Regions:
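PLP-dependent class I/II
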Residues: 2-5, 13-35, 41-57, 87-410
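Substrate/cofactor-recognition hotspot
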Residues: 9
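Short gly/ser-rich anion-binding loops that grip negatively charged ligand groups
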Residues: 40, 61-68
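Generic short alpha-helical segment signal, independent of protein family or function
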Residues: 55-63, 83
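Conserved N-terminal alpha-helix of the aminotransferase class I/II PLP-enzyme fold
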Residues: 65-99
Length: 410
């Protein structure tokens, strides 16, 4: 630990996903034809009606501080949309807190619920920021390995094996980043029942809920009975479904007292989210004319998913991967080509960008350095070119490994 810094950031490390994008940008500035399939954001523009709402808010002078919990118009629009997505169940706008992105919503929840000498279970592989957020909250993240035979999801049995009296929280993410795995409603119900028995809070990150390749939206904790939601914080936002990553709008739905506490915490950190962005997000969640664009983007992601899965099965038949049922990532194993020169996925990705100018994210960012994440939030041309480069790299590394074995045998 650097003696200049406090214990609050002792275990903190920078985002590996952003580091990949930064390296890709550096190579582009040098004139290299880089294919970047590392980005975790939709490649589509923000819907026109949404962008225009942000402009109107600016022109109308809606540029002052917003309430810490968010403008009522956005909270009401989110409440209505969540209600519609979950079969019309009542959702109260007073239980919603708007933040500067879903990441801040997760952080607000963790800071309000967890602290020193307490543990938070995190199914792994997991989004790179979850354990970092828990560390900054001075709690201890405990990664629970997902089952490779079950799309790297975890069951109650795995959670139970890691539980002790110090476990106070569980962070869930479905559809998942980096795996694209989706928990069924029955699986969510079993986990919620387990958490209730154990007195464990669930922070459910459902930012990818609308990007689902099954029927309708992905199953949600919000689809469960009220008695299973008493210790659940549901996190969502505008970034993924509405292609609004740069607008920085996240939301949390929580029990009333916790929602008030999260808003109070935010009042002492960032204050309310960007006012103009909130008006744009109110249009996104509230205007029914915008929703077909979400469906169109999801349909495009589905076609890309199908293309990737088809090429992997045909051209990389020995490579294990999780078939994504949501989000826009393909997570695949690369340890078959590990050797002296490429001992892990981090080095695999370093070699990949050096040899083929293809940027992917190593699994170390998500807790398992045998895997790599490929984002198909990219153009069809970039995907075709990217897979071509990836296939060449697998062949190159397999040849290097075979040559090394021959030399060792000789």
């Amino acid at each position: 630990m650097n003696a200049l810094f406090s214990r609050n950031v002792a275990a903190l490390s920078p985002s590996a996903t952003l580091a990949v994008s930064a390296e890709a940008a550096r190579l582009r500035r040098e004139g290299v034809n880089v294919v970047d399939l590392g980005a975790g954001e939709p490649d589509f523009p923000t819907p026109k009606l949404v962008a225009e709402a942000g402009v109107r808010a600016t022109q109308a002078g809606k540029t002052k501080y917003a309430a810490n919990e968010g403008i009522l118009e956005l909270r009401a629009a989110v409440a209505r949309r969540l209600s519609l997505l979950s079969g019309g169940r009542p959702v109260n706008a007073d239980n919603i807190v708007v933040s500067n992105g879903a990441k801040q919503s997760v952080m607000n929840a963790c800071f309000c619920l967890f602290g020193g000498r307490e543990k938070v279970l995190i199914p792994s592989p997991a989004w790179t920021s979850y354990p970092q957020i828990v560390h900054v909250a001075r709690a201890t993240p405990v990664e629970v390995a997902g089952d490779p035979e079950w799309s790297l999801k975890v069951s109650v049995d795995e959670l139970d094996r890691e539980w002790d009296e110090s476990v106070k929280g569980l962070i869930m993410n479905s559809p998942g980043n980096p795996t694209g795995a989706v928990y069924t409603l029955a699986e969510l119900k079993a986990i919620a029942e387990w958490a209730k028995r154990k007195g464990v809070w669930i922070v459910a990150d459902e930012i990818y809920r609308r990007i689902h390749y099954g029927d309708g939206v992905a199953p949600s904790f919000l689809d469960l009975p009220d008695d299973l939601l008493e210790q659940v914080v549901l996190v969502d936002g505008a970034s993924k479904a509405y292609a609004m990553t740069g607008w920085r709008i996240g939301v949390a739905l929580a029990p009333r007292e916790l929602a008030r506490t999260m808003a109070a915490l935010q009042s002492h950190t960032t204050s309310g989210a960007n006012t103009m962005a909130q008006w744009a997000a109110a249009e996104a969640f509230g205007n029914d004319l915008v929703q077909p664009e979400v469906e169109a983007m999801t349909a495009a992601f589905r076609l890309r998913r199908d293309y990737l899965v088809g090429r992997f099965r045909k051209e990389l038949p020995g490579v294990e991967f999780v078939e994504p049922m949501g989000a826009f990532y393909l997570f695949f194993r690369v340890d078959d080509v590990f050797g002296k020169s490429v001992p892990n996925a981090t080095e695999f990705c370093r070699r990949l960008i050096a040899d083929e100018a293809l940027a992917l994210v190593p699994g170390a960012a998500f807790g398992d350095d045998r895997w790599v994440r490929l984002s198909y939030a990219a153009s069809d041309e970039a995907l075709r070119d990217g897979v071509d480069r990836l296939v060449r790299q697998f062949a190159r590394l397999a040849s290097e490994k075979a040559d090394a074995s021959k030399q060792k045998a000789g």
